[in-house]
């Protein structure tokens, strides 16, 4: 038979115990942002490594860190713009709890965390694509069908990749709000 991925949603998880619940983000005009691609930050490539380097970030006198995409993407060597699962942290960087710990530590040190999110498209492994796709070969891969409430059958522009979100759709608007 054909092997396919399955999407699993974890429910009933223990909530993270945030140490800082009243962080106030800097005003936009006051932002001093340091952009981080975790994959290239250093050889460790993990959230834990960012946690361990908080003094480095503080010494830069920044007040915000922008994380290039950290959501689950296809493959392991990527900038993350080939997102497959928006609701999952990529396995390459470590567990979700470590990301939350990093955010909390940044907030304890007056540093905001900004996520670079990819909401223009999604790659073929996404269950949002697979639920409404044309699969002419029956191999689990295909393009969005006209029944898809989320995607354009054909991208409405020439500069995209993956499956193009239909941002006019109320489903997409709800999903991306």
Where are these regions (language model features)?
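Substrate-binding/active-site clefts of carbohydrate-active enzymes
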Residues: 14-15, 19-31, 37-177
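Alpha-glucan (starch/glycogen) binding determinants
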Residues: 1-11
């Amino acid at each position: 038979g054909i092997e396919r991925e399955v999407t699993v949603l974890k429910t009933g998880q223990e909530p993270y115990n945030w140490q800082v619940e009243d962080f106030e983000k800097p005003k936009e005009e006051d932002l001093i942002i340091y952009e981080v691609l975790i994959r290239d930050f250093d050889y460790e490539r993990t959230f834990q490594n960012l946690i361990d380097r908080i003094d480095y970030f503080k010494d830069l006198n920044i007040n915000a860190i922008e994380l290039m995409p950290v959501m689950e993407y296809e493959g392991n060597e990527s900038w993350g713009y080939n997102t497959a699962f928006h609701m999952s942290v990529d396995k390459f960087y470590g567990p979700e709890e470590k990301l939350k710990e990093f955010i909390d530590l940044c907030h304890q040190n007056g540093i905001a965390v900004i996520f670079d999110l990819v909401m223009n498209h999604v790659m073929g492994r996404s269950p949002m694509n697979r639920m409404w796709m044309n699969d002419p070969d029956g191999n689990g891969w295909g393009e969005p069908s006209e029944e898809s409430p989320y995607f354009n059958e054909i991208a409405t522009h020439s500069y995209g990749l993956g499956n193009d979100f239909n941002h006019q759709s109320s489903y997409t608007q709800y999903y991306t709000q």
